[in-house]
A protein has these predicted regions:
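Generic structural signal for residues in well-ordered beta-strands
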Residues: 8, 80-82, 326
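Active-site-proximal alpha-helix that buttresses catalytic centers in soluble enzyme cores
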Residues: 263-329
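Conserved nucleotidyltransferase catalytic core and NTase-mimicking acidic/glycine-rich helix/loop elements
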Residues: 115-260
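Residues at beta-strand starts and edge strands
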Residues: 24-26, 76-78, 237, 264
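Conserved NTP/Mg2+-binding pocket subregion across the NTase superfamily
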Residues: 40-169
Length: 337
């Protein structure tokens, strides 16, 4: 036990294979009440003590304390990917990286609190594919720069802060990173489409790959070869792996754009400023109009239907965005809390 730590969870490939000899690294998520330099050092020391008592596969121990999909030579190293968050950091991660945290929630390899009990990701939404951290655009940007964006704690006397860095893609990571991208994008889309937090089956993975890529079988065959290399813990991948990744992401982005057209978009909007915009509480007791003189909305489209509370400020705001009068609903009135 380490004082301040409330949760330790093993996530990633080990929770599916149960075989240390067949994984690239052992992913461990640690949640603490507070992040300190001492806590990070103590956690590393604890990992070293455990592995020294129970030598694993006659490999040299390597502790990767960065946040990101960087891999090391699994034939030489037993890598422990140690990811430490404080409670606030975990909440931020769950909000900004829902794909990762949603996946971690499936793990039953934990001590202390389950990750979902600390702060849950309830579902994957279509907007996550466009706005969340490590979305397809972020991946494509990293591939074109030949770098992987990672984060690492910077420890100083006064504080511990998380800084963004870039790791140059080497011959191993260009294949590992592309596999990570394709595998995660397909699995994340499957979670959204099925509305279930499950890993897609091998059969359905192939079907989704071909659906997304418009039945591009040559690309599918290249990915299957890449997958075999990963299973065999390859240390070097072809330069063409990057092209595979870029082509798949291009397909995926177009596929998502087409999918997004099938769904209705809901927009929640607060009323515009009023003449009593003085940081006092309005509630239902006061009913001022909005300052229309300061509003010059430039809209490419009008919305219909639009729902509004019966208050003047809400009705006037709603009329700026639609051709028809808004539908009035009492439930949208500001609460007198």
């Amino acid at each position: 036990k380490i004082e301040g730590i409330i949760s330790v969870t093993i996530v990633g490939s080990f929770t599916r294979t149960y075989d240390l000899d067949k994984i690239g690294d052992l992913d461990i998520v640690i949640i603490s009440k507070k992040i300190t330099g001492k806590l990070i050092k103590t956690s590393k020391k604890k990992i070293k003590n455990i592995t020294s008592k129970y030598p694993i596969l006659n490999k040299k121990l390597k502790i990767n304390d960065t946040f990101g999909p960087v891999k090391y030579d699994a034939t030489k190293y037993f890598t422990v990917h140690m990811m430490i968050y404080d409670i606030k950091g975990h909440i931020d991660h769950a909000i900004n990286s829902p794909f990762t945290c949603y996946d971690w929630q499936r793990s039953n390899w934990f001590k202390g609190k389950k990750l979902k009990a600390i702060f849950p990701v309830e579902n994957i939404y279509l907007r996550d594919f466009f706005e969340a951290r490590r979305n397809s655009k972020d991946y494509l940007r990293d591939l074109k720069k030949n770098k992987i964006s990672i984060r690492k704690y910077q420890i100083s006397i006064k504080k511990v802060s998380l800084k963004k860095r870039y790791y140059k893609i080497n011959t191993k990571n260009r294949g590992e990173f592309v596999f990570h991208i394709v595998n995660n994008l397909i699995n994340n889309y499957n979670k959204f489409y099925t509305n279930k937090n499950i890993k897609v089956s091998s059969k359905n993975f192939g079907k989704l790959f071909l659906k997304i890529t418009k039945n591009d079988r040559p690309l599918w065959n290249k990915f299957k070869y890449l997958s075999k290399q990963k299973i065999n813990l390859s240390t070097s991948y072809s330069n063409k792996s990057i092209l595979l990744g870029e082509k798949f992401i291009t397909y995926f982005n177009q596929f998502l754009r087409n999918e997004s057209k099938k769904y209705k978009r809901l927009v929640f909007l607060r009323h515009a400023k009023t003449f009593v915009n003085d940081k006092t509480f309005l509630g239902q007791g006061r009913n001022p109009e909005i300052l229309k003189i300061k509003l010059k909305p430039k809209l490419k489209e009008k919305y219909n239907p639009i729902y509004s509370s019966p208050l003047k400020r809400s009705i006037s705001t709603a009329k700026l965005f639609g051709k028809k009068n808004p539908i009035i609903n009492e439930y949208l009135s500001e609460i007198n809390y």
